Amino acid sequence: SQRALSRKWISDTGVFAMAAEGIVHFVDDEYKLFADAFRAEAPGRLFGISNEDRPPGWDHAVMVEQSTEDELEQIAIEFFGQYFLLFSEDERHAVLFTQADYKLIAGPLPFLHRFFPDLSAQKREFIEFKNEELSYPHTAWVELVLENAVRFMDWLD
């Protein structure tokens, strides 16, 4: 299995990716939204993999048998404040949670439509978010990751 959403994985699996603003891993009612989306489109186990070095004694990976709101909340607690990848057993549905106030959601179009009924509108909304973030003092790293997130949505052009 993998630890990141790579362009090769996206190409090899034939899935698509969308970026979304997210100051924390899950906001508002997203536990329900994500649980419902994974249950409907990718039934089976979910895996969470940290993309960071973890202190000794901390789990690097977590598996849950079902995607329920409670299970997703436990995963969010386990990986609080860290980059982590949440993906389905078939590895065709994934969410990369970042520390840079956004997440990437990848999968077949029906999976993406559960989050974003209008994909073009979501791309515009994320570009507005990126532009606003870059209007404040920021590091080159922030600019790089936000620009890269937008490039993941180039398939919509």
Question: What is each model feature region?
Answer:
Residues S1-K103, G107-D157:
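Structured alpha/beta or helical-core interaction and ligand-binding surfaces enriched in interleaved
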